[in-house]
Structure formats: structure tokens, C-alpha cells
Curated annotation (Swiss-Prot):
InterPro entries given in the database record: DUF2682
Pfam families: DUF2682
Protein name in UniProt: Uncharacterized 11.5 kDa protein in IAP2-VLF1 intergenic region
Organism encoding this protein: Autographa californica nuclear polyhedrosis virus
Length: 99
């Protein structure tokens, strides 16, 4: 497989995963009160921990993608994905520690 095709495939896969996680982040940010269950009472911040772990894994995965110096457009896409991931991490962290 061509290197740039491989990078594009990785970026598309990563972008789709990030969009899915962003939906979960949106639900977390828009929830006024957590759903209290016996399980959630035993593990406070469980949803935050899950989202933080998933976002961090995707950030590490994103940073592992290697680009050719000539692939300026792919680098822009990659940087935008990283900005979204960092933005989501910041938002859930603020909500978690302010509540």
C-alpha cells in the first residue's frame, strides 16, 4: 500500500473514532446530574475517567502517525484532529473538577 494512502486511511479511521468520542463528550458535558447507580456511587468520576482514557489513547495514536514532509494538507488535518482531542480533554477536565 502506498504510504500516503496508508496515512489517509489512518487519518480517516482516527477521525471517525474521534467523532464518536466527541458525541460521548457532548453527552457528558450536557448532563446536569450524573446517573446514580450502585456502580457509579462506588466509582465516582467513572465516565470522566473513561472519556479521559479514550481521548488520551487517540491522542497517542494520532501522534504515532508519520507524515512525509510534502503532505501539507494531511498535516493540517492531523493538527485539527489533535486540536479537537485536546479541546475535549480540557472541557471534560474543567467539568470534572468544577463539579
Amino acid at each position: 500500500m502506498n504510504t500516503s494512502v496508508d496515512v489517509v486511511t489512518k487519518l480517516i479511521h482516527l477521525q471517525n473514532n474521534v467523532l464518536d468520542i466527541m458525541r460521548e463528550v457532548d453527552q457528558y458535558l450536557n448532563s446536569d446530574t450524573p446517573d446514580y447507580t450502585i456502580e457509579s456511587l462506588n466509582a465516582p468520576g467513572k465516565q470522566f475517567d473513561f472519556l479521559d482514557e479514550m481521548l488520551t489513547k487517540k491522542l497517542i495514536e494520532s501522534n504515532a502517525i508519520v507524515f512525509d514532509e510534502k503532505s501539507k494538507n494531511l498535516k493540517i488535518i492531523h493538527n485539527n484532529i489533535n486540536m479537537c482531542l485536546n479541546w475535549c480533554i480540557n472541557l471534560i477536565t474543567i467539568k470534572h473538577y468544577v463539579q
